[in-house]
Amino acid sequence: MKLGLPYKGSKNTIAEEIVSKLPPGHKILDACCGGGAVLMALALSLKYDSVVGNDLNPATIALLDAVLINKGQIEYEHPPVCTRDDFFNSLQRIENGDFDIQDCVNKFCASFGNDGKTYLYGAQIEEYKLAAEQMLTAETLEQRRKFYRKFYSLINADNSEDKERLQKLEFMQRLQSLERLERLERLERLERLERLERLERLERLDIFDIDYKEFDVVYFDIPYKGTNKYDFEFDYDRFYSLFKSLKTDLNINAFLSEYDAPFTCVAEFEKTQLMAAAVGSSKTTSREKLYYNGSADEYRALMGRNFDEKSEQLSLF
């Protein structure tokens, strides 16, 4: 199953591979846990007695908490509809710091491409999609019948003679997938997961303010350098100093996901991401690397019998 929240840049396709390249330990920190894919893989792996997640994004931490720790906060059977206005009102409340769990659900489940910024449905199909959602999830049979009739009338009204058959077919294909409900189903499946008792807590701290002394392994997934995908400036030089000092000053083994970094590369992963489009979708593939704040020999010793001599990591030394 897919791990983590519906999240742009999610590592759900490679999370378990990443965890397999990390050494076992007592307590591990996922310092930039984002949508929680690696965090959940860590908890499920049973390689650690305790797992802690951290991220600066308040909506992310609130939703992870609702799905993984303090469960029962999200309505799955009859989820509230999320119109375009609802979506942007939720974003505003999150920005103001005065939000509830439904605002977090709206942000992550009703955004296009999981970007948390753009409303999921285009203006051309929004009315159809919302009617289709509600004919499946409205609380009463009477309400579901009402939205079924609305959906049916919308489809029939759109069946005018000036529309070509191919255009109509493409339009109907776009209506088949109710992405928001699919993402809610994903959250519900995650909430039902067991074996997450090793997930100790979630925090919301700047990575430069964390007291790392309680951890013997730390994993970072910082903004990738040169990608220009973020609305804030990240101090890479300061981070590199922190990453290095965890080993030299505290003897903490730290790992970093990046495309390129000035540290020991211990593994590579091929990540495929599905990119949403107006009709259909496309795939992009990238090579992500895992870096270590020690030497190659130290990494081999850390992994012990778990070091995979046959894996691609061997050629990186």
Where are these regions (language model features)?
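Short, solvent-exposed loop/turn segments at secondary-structure junctions
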Residues: 12, 35-38, 57-60, 69, ...
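Active-site flanking residues adjacent to catalytic metal/cofactor-binding acidic residues
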Residues: 29, 54, 220
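Class I S-adenosyl-L-methionine-dependent methyltransferase module
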Residues: 45, 49-201, 316
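Mobile active-site "lid"/loop adjacent to the S-adenosyl-L-methionine
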Residues: 119-121, 126-130, 226-238
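Active-site segment flanking the S-adenosylmethionine/decSAM binding pocket
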Residues: 203-236
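Long, positively charged, glycine-interspersed low-complexity recognition regions
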Residues: 225, 231-317
